[in-house]
Amino acid sequence: MLFRSSCDLTPTEFRLLYQLALDRGRVVTRDELLQKLWGRRESRRDRTVDVFVRRLREKIDRRAPRHTFIQTRYGVGYKLEPELKAERVTLS
């Protein structure tokens, strides 16, 4: 079990997570997310999706700090694909 307690999400954060879960393992473009969640087309200056993905990641990371759930495909979009974070090695 990854989560031992609930994660308080806003309705928009929940809808974002739900949409990514529906397409689990597939990259969902920012434009698709903007259209499905906010009903509008992407503008190059519109950072709405990025802001909500960041907030959602922060909340999930607090519950499961050893995992990464939302992967970024730079220049394309996001996908929900849980992975273990790499261990950091400190050289003395």
Where are these regions (language model features)?
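Positively charged, aromatic-enriched patches within helix-turn-helix-type DNA-binding elements
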Residues: S6-V76
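Short, small-residue-biased leader/transition segments that mark boundaries at the very start
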Residues: M1-L2
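Basic, Lys/Arg-enriched C-terminal extension of HTH/homeodomain DNA-binding domains
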Residues: R66-S92
